[in-house]
Amino acid sequence: MRNTISSKMGQVLIVLLLLCTVLCRTESALPSGQHSVLLTGRRLMGSGASGPVRSSQSSQAGGRFNDADPIAIDYGKY
């Protein structure tokens, strides 16, 4: 009984060490400027849209022109 517990604890320790090694190596592989780019992207995604989408923007993006279309949603109302 004691041998199985110690062997399982050894396996858990090895897995944790490997996980820490992999995480440290992947973080060091990222360039230092990459972190600021990720934070800027998160800020932009979190800010949301500022006002309703104009028809010229919608047509350039391939949007629909029909107001009765249930898929076309005006996010400026919300």
Swiss-Prot record:
User: What keywords sit in the KW lines?
Assistant: Apoplast, Cell membrane, Cleavage on pair of basic residues, Jasmonic acid signaling pathway, Membrane, Plant defense, Secreted, Signal, Stress response
Signal peptide, first to last residue:
1-24
| Induction comment | Triggered by AtPep1. Induced by Erwinia amylovora, a bacterial pathogen. Accumulates upon infection by generalist herbivores such as Spodoptera littoralis.
Please give the start and end residues of each transmembrane region. Answer: none
Q: Name one GO molecular function term.
A: receptor serine/threonine kinase binding
Q: Write out the annotated subcellular location.
A: Cell membrane; Secreted, Extracellular space, Apoplast
Q: Where is this motif: SxS motif essential for MIK2 binding?
A: 56-58
Q: What happens when the gene is disrupted?
A: Enhanced root growth leading to longer primary roots due increased differentiated cells size. Increased accumulation of reactive oxygen species (ROS) such as superoxide anion O(2) and hydrogen peroxide H(2)O(2). Reduced susceptibility to necrogenic bacterial pathogens (e.g. Erwinia amylovora) and necrotrophic fungal pathogens (e.g. Alternaria brassicicola) infection and pathogenic induced cell death leading to the reduction of necrotic symptoms in leaves. These symptoms are associated with disturbed expression of various genes related to stress responses.
Give the record's GO biological process terms: cell-cell signaling involved in cell fate commitment; defense response to insect; indole glucosinolate biosynthetic process; jasmonic acid biosynthetic process; negative regulation of reactive oxygen species metabolic process; plant-type cell wall organization; regulation of defense response to bacterium; regulation of defense response to fungus
Q: What is its main location?
A: membrane
Region of interest (Disordered), ranges: 47-78
Keyword Nucleotide-binding appears in the UniProt entry: no
A Gene Ontology cellular-component term = apoplast
Top-rank taxon: Eukaryota
Query: Motif range for SCOOP motif?
Result: 50-64
Q: In which tissues is it expressed?
A: Mostly expressed in the whole root system, and, to a lower extent, in seedlings shoots.
Instruction: Report the family membership.
Output: Belongs to the serine rich endogenous peptide (SCOOP) phytocytokine family.
Please give the function described in this protein's UniProt entry.
Brassicaceae-specific phytocytokine (plant endogenous peptide released into the apoplast) perceived by MIK2 in a BAK1/SERK3 and SERK4 coreceptors-dependent manner, that modulates various physiological and antimicrobial processes including root growth prevention, phospholipid signaling pathway activation (e.g. accumulation of phosphatidic acid (PA), but transient reduction of phosphatidylinositol 4,5-bisphosphate (PIP(2)) levels) and reactive oxygen species (ROS) response regulation.
* Subunit note: Interacts with MIK2 (via extracellular leucine-rich repeat domain); this interaction triggers the formation of complex between MIK2 and the BAK1/SERK3 and SERK4 coreceptors, and subsequent BAK1 activation by phosphorylation on 'Ser-612'.
- Please give the name of this protein: Serine rich endogenous peptide 12
Q: Which organism is it from?
A: Arabidopsis thaliana
At the highest ranks, the source species' classification is: Eukaryota, Viridiplantae, Streptophyta, Embryophyta, Tracheophyta
